[in-house]
Structure formats: C-alpha cells, structure tokens
Amino acid sequence: MSFMKEFREFAMRGNVVDMAVGVIIGGAFGKIVSSLVGDVVMPVLGILTGGVDFKDLKFVLAEAVGETPAVTLNYGLFIQNVFDFIIIAFAIFMMVKGINKLKKPVEEAPKGPTSEELLSEIRDLLKK
C-alpha cells in the first residue's frame, strides 16, 4: 500500500475528521468565551469592585531599570483566565451532559443461568 493511500485512509477515518472539526470549533469557541470574559464579564466585575481594571492588577517584583522592563506577577490576567476556564469547562460539561442524554441506554444482555442452575441441570441429565 502506498504512503499516500495509507495517509488518505487514516485522514478520512471518522474519528480523525471528527477530532479535527472539534479542535477547530473549540478554538473558535475559546475566542468567543475569551471575548465574553474580557469585554463583558470583567468590566462589569471591575465596576462592582470599585472601577478596578483586572488586566492592570499586578505585583511588581523588580522595578524597571533603564531599558530593562519591570518584573511583574500579573495576577489580574490570571483571574481573567480563571474566568475563561470556568465558563469553557461549564459549557463543555453541559454539552457532554446533553449528548449523554441523547444516547440510547445500553441494554443489558439477558442473564444466563447461574453456575448452580447449570450444575443442577447436568446432575439431572446424568441421573437419566
């Protein structure tokens, strides 16, 4: 089998195509959620906390010296990313929960006779 034919078969398998679509949609969804958090949620939260802009919250570990920039710990951006994560995780949880509801429940295979019942049948057959 040629290399290209093998690659084509691999790429056209359902799982690979589904995963590629999921990654593309996930990337776009991540941008939407980041915009929601950065442009809608955080400004409202900033107003509720007295006009604080979370993007600017930071601890200065070392001041800027000459051309060397300051060393900062940007905890405001971290808080914003935590909000991003929580919203994305909740949305994925809700999608998985919805998909699981749509799946048909797996029917259990009919239970066969127990070992004791089989042994009793064998015993009865041997008595004949």
From Swiss-Prot:
Its membrane topology: Multi-pass membrane protein
Keywords: Cell inner membrane, Cell membrane, Ion channel, Ion transport, Membrane, Transmembrane, Transmembrane helix, Transport
Superkingdom per UniProt: Bacteria
Keyword Magnesium included in the entry's annotation: no
Xref: InterPro entries: Mechanosensitive_channel_CS, MS_channel, MSC/AndL, MscL_channel
GO molecular function: mechanosensitive monoatomic ion channel activity
Keyword Membrane: yes
Compartments, as annotated in UniProt: Cell inner membrane
Pfam family membership, one: MscL
TM segment ranges: 10-30, 76-96
Gene Ontology cellular component list: plasma membrane
Family: Belongs to the MscL family.
Quaternary data: Homopentamer.
Protein role: Channel that opens in response to stretch forces in the membrane lipid bilayer. May participate in the regulation of osmotic pressure changes within the cell.
HAMAP family linked to this entry: MscL (MF_00115)
Protein name: Large-conductance mechanosensitive channel
